[in-house]
């Protein structure tokens, strides 16, 4: 039993001089354990029950040792945490003591710096208050609101204790002055600033700044007008920050720009006792031409997307129609059902006229027939045509050929000559002896008179090697051919 316990872990706990706990844990060496085993072997062998008891006791000892180690570790961590808290408290107390000492020193310095004249004026002021007590009470008692603080100056020097308020505070007439400071969050608008961006685009940007006074005494003693100074600083900061940004970054990263501007202003106004809470970029005004260009670009992009969407829709619709056509081609009953559905939809629209499509199979028989040929009138033999036009000069033949198809003149005189046939061809029998007074639609009168003179001077035409035949016996239409 003693050998087994000696083979367990041995823990030594010691308390150092500085209050920390040291835990030392060591194991029995292998040589000692082997010697213990040899001594146990020399002893008379015990029963199996004794061996079991020894093994269980050794396990219990090990468990107890581990538990004690854990408890010691927890206690050491607690002690270290307490020591840290104590050190922090001591540091804070030391800082408070230093501040109190500094305040006492400042108060003593202020009292010493008043001098003899200061003390004389102070005593006279207190005497004046005492002798005019009912009236002076109204002049000495002042009130500041919950959101205000009063910074008091006596003979031009800051009074110890910092700003007064909220509530009632007393001042000494004639030697004390005070200034109220509002501690609420204030805001001002940064006027629009003309800024040249990084990509050489001129824009007008305005913003809003939210700030508050964090230290009333510093805001009065270190800067003349904290709000005005912060406003001027915000204008220059806005120009400096946005000058390093592109137009796309100005339009998309407004939150990052606002955060960067707020950080910069807060660091710059900290010596003034001002805390910048928030900065917001209100508007980025672009030139009119640039706005139009951007609008046109956006519209073109939207149209392109719309075309892509329409094309994709048509593609899907065509695929669906293809599949529907394949299904309808496989089953003729589906086509008949579709036909009936179409008729039903047409009749449901309250139309007075319903169109029933005629089957194309029945129209195919009519479409295969060829139209009848139009018979041409018999042409005049070449000999007769050459005979008829042989006696006239070339300029007459050209005139007759060009005017033959378009003449529509009608004779209004008895013996006048001219082209008076319905086909517009010349007939020799119509030649007269005198000038013709015939008028032709679309033909000048002088031209008709020349044709009449020519017809009167033309000799009779006779066919060679045949009997005398007058041209008037021929059809005027054949003369053209």
Curated annotation (Swiss-Prot):
Residues 86-104 have a biased composition (Basic and acidic residues). GO terms for cellular component: neuron projection; neuron projection membrane; plasma membrane. Residues 403-421 have a biased composition (Gly residues). GO terms for molecular function: cholesterol binding; sodium channel activity. Signal peptide: none annotated. One of its GO terms (biological process) is response to mechanical stimulus. Residues 27-38, 463-473 have a biased composition (Polar residues). InterPro entries: Band-7_stomatin-like (IPR043202), Band_7 (IPR001107), Band_7/SPFH_dom_sf (IPR036013), Band_7/stomatin-like_CS (IPR018080), Stomatin_HflK_fam (IPR001972). Its main location: membrane. It is a single-pass membrane protein. Residues 1-22, 433-447 have a biased composition (Low complexity). Residues 1-67, 80-104, 403-481 are annotated as: Disordered. It is found in: Membrane. The chain crosses the membrane at residues 115-135. It holds the Pfam family Band_7. Keywords: Ion channel, Ion transport, Membrane, Potassium, Potassium transport, Sodium, Sodium channel, Sodium transport, Transmembrane, Transmembrane helix, Transport. Subunit of an amiloride-sensitive cation channel (degenerin channel complex) permeable for sodium, potassium, lithium and N-methylglucamine, and required for mechanosensory transduction (touch sensitivity). Positively regulates the activity of the putative mechanosensory transduction channel. May link the mechanosensory channel and the microtubule cytoskeleton of the touch receptor neurons. Required for the function of a set of six touch receptor neurons. Belongs to the band 7/mec-2 family. Component of a non-voltage-gated amiloride-sensitive cation channel complex (also called the degenerin channel complex) composed of at least the mec-2, mec-4, mec-6 and mec-10 subunits; the complex mediates mechanotransduction in touch cells. Interacts with mec-6 and mec-4. This is Mechanosensory protein 2. It comes from Caenorhabditis elegans.
